[in-house]
């Protein structure tokens, strides 16, 4: 009789649970927007920065572009019909010289990265699997960027 009880425990019970909800891509699209914004902001800030700061900002921009690419891939994988947001390129457009604004200060980049790290960290805590790992990695990278790579005396408050 013990074997029969174990056999029953091992068999699937289809009516006991509902399938998990399909993952929403909206949250990832928000992360994609943040990644693109951070990349553009770091690129713009690099224009007027001294050499060590310039190099760090260019690296931050490249990392955030990689995040945007990874998010775009994940959105396309999750979405049945990918939206136009997930098909956009991650290359920022270059403004004309007459319309160019002064480069943003380093503190703006740090603030933006901090907000992006916090957002990705919160979303990672409510996610699972690959998505949680991707978001956790993005949060860690943004945190390292503003606490280590861009630690040139910029105030982030």
Which residues does each PLM region occupy?
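All-alpha RGS (Regulator of G-protein Signaling) helical domain and cognate RGS-like helical scaffolds
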Residues: 2-157
């Amino acid at each position: 009789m013990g074997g029969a009880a174990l056999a029953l425990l091992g068999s699937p019970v289809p009516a006991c649970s509902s399938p998990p909800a399909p993952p929403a891509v909206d949250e990832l699209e928000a992360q994609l927007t943040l990644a693109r914004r951070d990349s553009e902001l770091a690129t713009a800030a690099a224009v007027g920065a001294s050499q060590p700061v310039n190099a760090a900002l260019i690296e931050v921009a490249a990392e955030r572009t990689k995040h945007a690419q990874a998010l775009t891939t994940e959105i396309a994988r999750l979405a049945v019909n990918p939206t136009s947001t997930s098909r956009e390129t991650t290359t920022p457009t270059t403004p004309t010289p007459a319309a160019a604004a002064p480069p943003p200060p380093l503190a703006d980049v740090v603030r933006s990265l901090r907000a992006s790290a916090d957002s990705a960290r919160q979303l990672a805590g409510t996610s699972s699997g690959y998505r949680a790992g991707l978001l956790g990695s993005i949060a860690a990278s943004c945190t390292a960027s503003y606490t280590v790579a861009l630690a040139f005396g910029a105030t982030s408050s």
